[in-house]
């Protein structure tokens, strides 16, 4: 398995997971140097190579619930 690393604001983040729900694809990332720096972005529908911010706190909660459900034991 190859580790995918993305550069965001001059910081290197590894992709932890990528999950889809309701026509959205969320990407969960952790800073390689600081694992407490955890971010969630979504794939831009117009350009699949672009990650964009979530729309609001409600969408963040939804994305985190999806992550929690996908990572249950």
PLM region descriptions:
Residues 1-21:
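Short, charged/polar N-terminal "headpieces" of proteins
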Residues 46-73:
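C-terminal structural segments of small proteins and small subunits
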Residues 18-49:
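Basic, polyanion-binding surface patches
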């Amino acid at each position: 398995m190859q580790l995918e690393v993305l550069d965001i604001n001059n910081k290197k983040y590894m992709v932890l997971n990528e999950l889809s729900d309701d026509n959205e694809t969320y990407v969960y990332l952790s800073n390689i140097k600081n694992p407490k720096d955890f971010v969630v972005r979504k794939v831009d529908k117009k350009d699949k190579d672009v990650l964009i911010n979530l729309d609001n706190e409600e969408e963040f909660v939804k994305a985190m619930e999806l992550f929690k459900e996908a990572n249950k034991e």
